[in-house]
Amino acid sequence: MAINIENRYRGLRAPHKIKMSVSGCTRECAEAQGKDVGIIATEKGWNLYVCGNGGMKPRHAELLATDLDERTLVAYIDRFLMFYIRTADRLQRTSVWLENLEGGIDYVRNVVCRDSLGIGAELEADMQRHVDTYECEWKRAIETPEIRRRFRHFVNSDAPDRNIVFVAERGQIRPARPHEREEELASA
């Protein structure tokens, strides 16, 4: 289950990083109740917890649904994540988002499990579009010479690399855009 979840949601752009966990039993060794999405196996299926948090402001996740079959579990996670992505503020963790959401976990449960807003199919379709179009950006960087040239060739060398050019902006340096790079190299 954990591998399926990881593969399904990899590369998902969200207001803040998303942490997930799957525990195979109620001993909860993977600490699923401290994650944004936590899944715990039961004798009848899966329990789904959401909006947990560790770190500076720890918060136990809230139980969203119990004894779910795998298909329903994935549908609820799809809906939850897409609803969070659509409605959360930039850099807002799921735990803070839930605290600020009028109606709290009951509202989320109504939207995700009972489809109270009538957007469940749309949220699932949005997630499926993400899954279907996922492309590993690092693999693309390695396989595309133009992108690969943007990375430093020798990490343990002080020798200059003509592929890496910086320009000054507001008292700091930043990587040059392609047209700026050409101008800098021509003037050097």
Regions from the language model: what does each represent?
Residues M1-A188:
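Peripheral terminal and linker regions in Fe-S/redox and tRNA-modifying enzymes
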